[in-house]
Amino acid sequence: MLDTVAQSPDIDALMNDIGRKARAASRPLAFASTESKNRALAAMADAILARKDHILAENAKDLKDVEGTDILASFVDRLTLTEKRVAEMAEGIRAIAALPDPVGEVFAAWDRPNGLKIERVRTPLGVIGVIFESRPNVTADAGALCLKAGNAVILRCGSDSRRSSQAILECLVEGLKAAGLPEHAIQLVPVTDRAAVGAMLRGLEGTIDVIVPRGGKSLVARVQSEARVPVFAHLEGLCHVYIDASADLDMAKAIVVNAKMRRTGICGSAETLLVDAKAAQTHLKPLLDGLTEAGCEIRASTEVLRLVPGLKTATEEDWSTEYLDAIISVTIVDGISGAIDHISRYSSNHTEAVIAEDPAVVERFFTEIDSAILLHNASTQFADGGEFGMGAEIGIATGKMHARGPVGVEQLTSFKYRVHGTGQIRP
């Protein structure tokens, strides 16, 4: 039976107990066999499919709670589970099981002149705290990824997704038990009190090794401000697409519409379109027509309005806004130099795309823009661990330390050195 608490008068005591259980579970996980971890993952996927109706019923209750509120449609989309999304959740877990086990991998080795043989070996991080909002699928993705990398995980979902996340957690715990692994290897914080987040950020008496926030700007800002443990920061998307004068127009139009409108509520959705001034006469209106026909609202700069009047005027705030909605800001820039300047000023360093046939333009874009993911002639919606072949992701890390870009199994490991000698002593 899983621990369930409606509310606790002593959040710190509750959370510290969760931390101790996670730390205890992390020890046997660190050297659990690949076979046992994969067996647990397979059982988790089976349980999710077997309990699909229950998961969807609990998700329907979560959705009912937000009915009539003023939340964005993109928020509701992230919260919503369907039969297809539940099936994809299970398939994602199976894909993680099929990945190579990173734990114990020797990824560097060398010999010293004194005869010492040195190896750098991947090891689990230990206990990972994941704080997320409105995305019940993160429960499955984070639980499975952390397990594959030999880590215990403490999950703190938003109150909006608590029923869905609990239903998914039950499937994950069933998988752990089926493989004989510690059931506290994956835990969901059973209270909605925000003090639980504060307790996690303080490290739960040293039991949490790293925090991964997955949510809006206010959550990530709080985590970065208050955390006393390392953070894999997943900032807002604010993705840009630059259309160079050398771009193929048909390709550019298809990519821009997909990058913005495939799913507007994900962090890989394009929020700003930059068009080379040399291509404005030929490319701008067809690009805007494609977006408008797809149901997207255009926020245009004065330069754009001179060529295509009648659109809503963009404000300074628009250039730094992650809409997560069917809205895009558009401006004209002075070639690749102007695009680099604009992106460098407003980007969150998440994902940017260049649509161009000129290799020199692509090379400058890739060299001079310092975002975690850069794409050439491809939609920003590919900014996803599953699309990168990682099975799934905990988030897109936009910082520069350790993990960057999609945080998958390999990024959830650290390393240690193994040094083999034959009796050497240091002179």
Curated annotation (Swiss-Prot):
Highest taxon of the lineage: Bacteria
Keyword Ribonucleoprotein: no
UniProt main location, coarse: cytoplasm
Pfam families in the cross-refs: Aldedh
Reactions the enzyme catalyzes: L-glutamate 5-semialdehyde + phosphate + NADP(+) = L-glutamyl 5-phosphate + NADPH + H(+)
SUPFAM superfamilies the UniProt entry points to: ALDH-like
Gene Ontology CC terms: cytoplasm
Functional pathway: Amino-acid biosynthesis; L-proline biosynthesis; L-glutamate 5-semialdehyde from L-glutamate: step 2/2
GO MF term set: glutamate-5-semialdehyde dehydrogenase activity; NADP binding
Keywords assigned by UniProt, alphabetized: Amino-acid biosynthesis, Cytoplasm, NADP, Oxidoreductase, Proline biosynthesis
Enzyme Commission (EC) number: 1.2.1.41
Enzyme class label: oxidoreductase
InterPro entries (alphabetical): Ald_DH/histidinol_DH, Ald_DH_C, Ald_DH_N, Aldehyde_DH_dom, G-glutamylP_reductase_CS, Glu-5-SA_DH, GPR_dom
Location in or out of the cell: Cytoplasm
GO BP annotations, alphabetical order: L-proline biosynthetic process
Family according to the record: Belongs to the gamma-glutamyl phosphate reductase family.
Biological role: Catalyzes the NADPH-dependent reduction of L-glutamate 5-phosphate into L-glutamate 5-semialdehyde and phosphate. The product spontaneously undergoes cyclization to form 1-pyrroline-5-carboxylate.
Identification of the protein by name: Gamma-glutamyl phosphate reductase
Organism: Rhizobium rhizogenes (strain K84 / ATCC BAA-868) (Agrobacterium radiobacter)
Lineage, top ranks: Bacteria, Pseudomonadati, Pseudomonadota, Alphaproteobacteria, Hyphomicrobiales
